[in-house]
Each structure stands twice: as C-alpha cells, then as structure tokens.
Amino acid sequence: MKLLILTLFLATIVLAQALTVPLNFHQASRESRRRVPQKWSNRLSALNAGTTIPISDFEDAQYYGAITIGTPGQAFKVVFDTGSSNLWIPSKKCPITVVACDLHNKYNSGASSTYVANGTDFTIQYGSGAMSGFVSQDSVTVGSLTVKDQLFAEATAEPGIAFDFAKFDGILGLAFQSISVNSIPPVFYNMLSQGLVSSTLFSFWLSRTPGANGGELSFGSIDNTKYTGDITYVPLTNETYWEFVMDDFAIDGQSAGFCGTTCHAICDSGTSLIAGPMADITALNEKLGAVILNGEGVFSDCSVINTLPNVTITVAGREFVLTPKEYVLEVTEFGKTECLSGFMGIELNMGNFWILGDVFISAYYTVFDFGNKQVGFATAIQG
C-alpha cells in the first residue's frame, strides 16, 4: 500500500520579490504512515517539557525540492516543512558506514568559496534516534533567491531506515526560530532580513487531481488564482509551531464533542494526514465505518466514499468542510486499490491537540503569515 504524497521539484517563477515553486504528486509507503504517532509524541512532548528541540520526521508526507548550497552551488533535495525550523543536509564528512549519507548527496565545504567554518555541535532527536552533526555557514539558493551567510547543519549521523531510503537529502524548516536547534535563524527569517522577499509570508496550494500539477509553494506572495472567496485568518497561540485554536469538529453537521471548551491545532506541511487524540480518532473512524487495522482506518470497499458524511473543522468561527473525497485516500500498491481514512490517532498527553496536515491543506489554500503571527485558510481551487 502506498500513500499519496506531494513532491516538490525545482521550477521557479520570480515575480516582484516573490518566489513560486510548482509541486508534483508522488507516493510513500503505508508502513511509514504508522510512525506518525511516535513522531509527534516525541516532537510535542519535548516542547511541553520546555526544550527548544524540534522533533520531526517525514516518512508520511514529503514536500521536497531542489536547493543549492555554496559557490558554486551543490544541489540537494530538501523537505519544506512547517513543523521544524532548521536546515540540515548530509556532510561529506559523514562516515561511509552511515547508509543515509552514502545514498544521498553530501555537502563538501572544501568545494565552496563562500563556506565559513563554525563547528558547533548539532543534534535533533527523532523517534528512531538522533540526527547529529555540526554547524556550518554558506550561501543557500532557492530558485533565484540566494540567502547569504546561512547557518545550517552538516549531518554525520542519521537514524533509521526512513532516512536511508528517503527521496530527499535533508530538511528545510519553516517554523519559528524559538524551536530552532542552537537558535539558528531559519532560512525564511534570513530571506526577510536580507530583503529577498517583500512580504512576510509564504503559502501552499496543493492539488489532489490525478495527473495534474501537484501544487505550489510561494515565498513572499499569495496566488489569488489558487483559491476562491475570502481568506480566514486565525491568530497563533504560540510562536513555536504554526499553532492556533480549533473551535470544533463536526460529523455530518453535528458536533462530535471532541473539543469540549476548545482544541489546539498545528498546521503542518510535513504530515499527510489529520491527526488527533487516539480516543477521538478511533470513535471518528468507527462512526465512518472504517475497520481499525494497526491504528489506522481502512474501508472495506472504496464504493462507500459516496455514502460517507462530510466532516467539518471550525477555525476562527468559520466552518471548513471536508467531503469524503477529500478525507479518504484512495491508494494503490501492487495492483490493489484500497481506501484509507485520512484521520490518524496519536497519544500526546496534551489534551485536545490536533495536527492539520495535507488532507486539510489540499482542500484549503494555506497562508503562513509570519509578520502578523497568523495562519489563513481559503477554499482551494482544484483542477
């Protein structure tokens, strides 16, 4: 079984100090989806404990695109992730015994005329172990935008097979500096401080139309042709992840009672699903008629999509409706097609905490407004 994911390839259009990067569809294994609970449990528990180390993984969804580092540029594919804040890539100094380094592009500081040594130790703790290395400084180019003097990590150890066979080389985080390892300014911060983009925001449009352009990531701009109606903004509750209040969750127009007084949610481009408390998601999937296998909802027959109810997520007083075609993932592996629920249960011990991933972002054009500390949603135009 494979999951639909979205892969970001380098292709850029620069308009008035803005950068737009088209996206394409790809697939990832079903097994990777099952690691979502462990990933987020580690990530948010660390935050709750007062640490500033972001913990994330990307097996379940991958937005990756080409960047270059150094002069002349050395090419890498990186995940663009709103759930972390650091940039890291494999180092040429990584031992050949580290498979993840051996199978991916590696940064060679000796080949760059703009490299500046730093050497500070760098570690991120993942569910499968620690990614460790050291900090370096160099120019980073995304499309036609070159960020000078960017601090990033050269990885010399990467944990688990998820990194060994990933389609990406490294990760480019798009969350806040407050959760950045070693308090390193994220790439988007430096885009702003160096005047490379004129607006303090970036936005995602994702398409789930088979065979169509997978979407786009825009730095410094909002593409008015990719959504309809108004953008509804919700203020952030923390300047860590892109976190905000989620008012309610309804099934077929009736509140499910999941939120009580309120829920908190994170909008994360590094997660393909909508994730929530295990008990709530189990009840939801059972109500939808999905069979729970290995913690995920599986429908016995894809024809049931036509009989399932809409679900509604309320944010900032606005109801954001998801139809069955939007929250059910129809996936094929080895010639067999199955339909999976787009809702995954997680145990965080943090109350009513939800993660709105690609299932939600593909239905609603999403604006990450750093300057005004808010996230905006509008009905995405598909097709």
UniProtKB/Swiss-Prot annotation:
Keyword terms of this UniProt record: Aspartyl protease, Disulfide bond, Glycoprotein, Hydrolase, Lysosome, Protease, Secreted, Signal, Zymogen
A Pfam match: Asp
Subcellular localization, as worded in the UniProt entry: Lysosome; Secreted
Residue ranges constituting the Peptidase A1 domain according to the UniProt record: 63-378
Propeptide cleavage-removed residue intervals: 19-48
EC code(s) of this entry: 3.4.23.5
Molecular function as annotated in GO: aspartic-type endopeptidase activity
Entry coiled-coil feature ranges: none
Protease among keywords: yes
Keyword Chloroplast carried by entry: no
Cystines in this chain: C94-C101, C259-C263, C302-C339
Major subcellular location class: other
Active site location: D81, D268
Function noted in UniProt: Protease that may act during cell growth and/or development.
Similarity annotation: Belongs to the peptidase A1 family.
Record's protein name: Cathepsin D
Organism of this sequence: Dictyostelium discoideum (Social amoeba)
